[in-house]
Every structure is written in structure tokens, then in C-alpha cells.
């Protein structure tokens, strides 16, 4: 329920609030700007699961990236020197893992560091073990896949991975 006029007590930080019937007379102009770092390599629709109804953008610095039936599903906001990301729901899928990874990098204002060790296929992942000079690229799918491995933001190599393969490489 609402407390002090807000459903989400951190609505100023999150950039969203929930309509519960007390602010129906207020105009809510939810315009979508789908271009954002968080969704740059997301293909197709994002699965928000059951999601959340009646969520609208709130404040001065929010950006609605995705919405459904005029209700916000993915919203970014700047607040003071910080950033926040609101997701209406996020069931597990490889694409949602990538979405969450990108959201974390954006919220931390570390977008430039995301491709220190990076693969561009959402069904693959990479881990670096700098102390021993190794990288592992993992195919998380039951199908063969192609991916590009980036190190320090530069394309290192193109890889073809067998289903569920883990490939070790030298850094």
C-alpha cells in the first residue's frame, strides 16, 4: 500500500511508481526511448515474465526503454551521482542474463569495462583467470554456436563452439 504518497518508497531513485488509484488525475506521459546501452545487443522481445501492471515513469531523469500497454517494464534513472534500473520481472534465460549483465555495468557507470572479457553470443559466456593467464569461453546451449571473443574491447578471435563446450585460451 502507499505510504507518504508513494507505493515504491524508493520511487525517486528507481524513476517509477505504481498507480494504485490515488493519482489517476495526474498526467503520466510514458514515452518510450528504446535506444539504450542496456538493450544494445538484445534481439527480439524481452521476457519480463508476469511483469508488473500499473507502473509508470516518475521523476525528472528517467528513461522508459520498454513498456507494455502503457506500463513501464524497463526503466533507467539517474539520481544524484548514481544510476538505477527498474525491471518489471526477469525470469531466467540466456538473453535475460545478458540484459542483467548490461544493466549492472550501466548502473555502475562502467560501460567501458564491459568488454574487457566479452563474448557477443548470449548463449555463451566468458570468464578470465588473470592470475594464471587463462580465459574460458563456455557454450551454455545444446547447439553449436559461433561467437566473437573480445579482450580489452578488441576482437580477439571468432570461435565455433560445440554444444556445451568449454574452450580454454591463453590471455
Task: Spell out what each predicted region is.
Residues 1-171:
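A conserved amphipathic helix/loop scaffold
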Amino acid at each position: 500500500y502507499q505510504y507518504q504518497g508513494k507505493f515504491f518508497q524508493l520511487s525517486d531513485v528507481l524513476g517509477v511508481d505504481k498507480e494504485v488509484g490515488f493519482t489517476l488525475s495526474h498526467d503520466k506521459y510514458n514515452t518510450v526511448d528504446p535506444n539504450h546501452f542496456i538493450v544494445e545487443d538484445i534481439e527480439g522481445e524481452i521476457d519480463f515474465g508476469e511483469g508488473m501492471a500499473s507502473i509508470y515513469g516518475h521523476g525528472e531523469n528517467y528513461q522508459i526503454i520498454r513498456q507494455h500497454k502503457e506500463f513501464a517494464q524497463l526503466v533507467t534513472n539517474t539520481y544524484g551521482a548514481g544510476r538505477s534500473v527498474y525491471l518489471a520481472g526477469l525470469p531466467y534465460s540466456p538473453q535475460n542474463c545478458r540484459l542483467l549483465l548490461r544493466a549492472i555495468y550501466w548502473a555502475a557507470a562502467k560501460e567501458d569495462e564491459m568488454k574487457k572479457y566479452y563474448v557477443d553470443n548470449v548463449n555463451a559466456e566468458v570468464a578470465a583467470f588473470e592470475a594464471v593467464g587463462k580465459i574460458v569461453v563456455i557454450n551454455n546451449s545444446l547447439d553449436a554456436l559461433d561467437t566473437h571473443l573480445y579482450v580489452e574491447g578488441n576482437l580477439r578471435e571468432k570461435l565455433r563452439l560445440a554444444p556445451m563446450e568449454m574452450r580454454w585460451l591463453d590471455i
